[in-house]
Amino acid sequence: MASGVGAACEELPPDGTCDECEPDEAPGAEEVCRDCGFCYCRRHADAHRQKFLSHRLAAYVHGAQAWTPPASGDDALPEDVEAKGEAEGEVESEVGEEESESEVDSESEEESETEEDSEDESDEESEEDSEEEMEDEQESEAEEDNQEGESEAEGETEAESEFDPEIEMEAERVAKRKCPDHGLDLSTYCQEDRQLICVLCPVIGAHRGHQLSTLDEAFEELRSKDSGGLKAAMIELVERLKFKSSDPKVTRDQMKVFIQQEFKKVQKVIADEEQKALHLVDIQEAMATAHVTEILADIQSHMDRLMTQMAQAKEQLDTSNESAEPKAEGDEEGPSGASEEEDT
């Protein structure tokens, strides 16, 4: 295997193997460098060409003079010059491609980094926006819940006051106990109009000159009336229907008209009985109200008497205290005056 350049190469001619490979494993040479005189296999020839761009490589011919060192750069063969130019162009193109690829890679990396940074920033901004939106939503939900709770409480209060049947019934009972014209308690009964009135209605109201009665009298009169009118009307209705239905001359239409007329009579009797029962209830309620009013009036008068007695007792106590004070002062002066006289 040859080594060295110039004259050294003349003393040690090439042995036909690659000078870069190991001697025991060196394959046959395929190219030879005209500048340094070394022989190379295909792989090391490519590596040598890329490393030394100015060196000229040619095909190695086994059994012949592989190369002769050139006298000067001008004596270089045109083929070698062209091969050198082509090699340099290929190397430059490869280097340019590598540089362009590296530039493209760097640009793509920068763009990807920029995109990642922008994505991170956008993610952070979106997270902040989402947190703010969540806080705003929570605040708005809390306000809505408070407003709903207040509105529900108000609605429940209004509903209780508006739709409570007990309150409505009590209001109706209170309104029924008062005269709609004068606002006084219903304490008298008008026999002509069959209506409860106050004490001012027969004096300055619409019941002047009417026959009146007390609540107790009206209640006893209504209760003592015979309530068998409804029963008698029903028995009479049944008998008349039997008699009418047994008449063969009565048509179906006539029977329908007859039934309607008879039931209207019974309905009138039922309405009278209903009105009577309602009057009894109203009179009882008015009597109870009057009784309670009397009891309250008695209690109030009793309390007034007690208050008067307490005031009188307090005045007497104050008077006795005032009369006792001068006497006590005189008793205190008495012993002191007596002692002074004894000293004199």
Curated annotation (Swiss-Prot):
Residues 290-325 form a coiled coil. Pfam families: zf-B_box. The keyword Phosphoprotein applies. One of its GO terms (biological process) is negative regulation of protein K48-linked ubiquitination. Keywords: Coiled coil, Metal-binding, Phosphoprotein, Zinc, Zinc-finger. GO terms for molecular function: ubiquitin protein ligase activity; zinc ion binding. Zn(2+) binds at residues 179, 182, 201, 207. GO terms for cellular component: cytoplasm. A zinc finger (B box-type) spans 174-215. This is Tripartite motif-containing protein 44. It comes from Rattus norvegicus (Rat). The gene is Trim44.
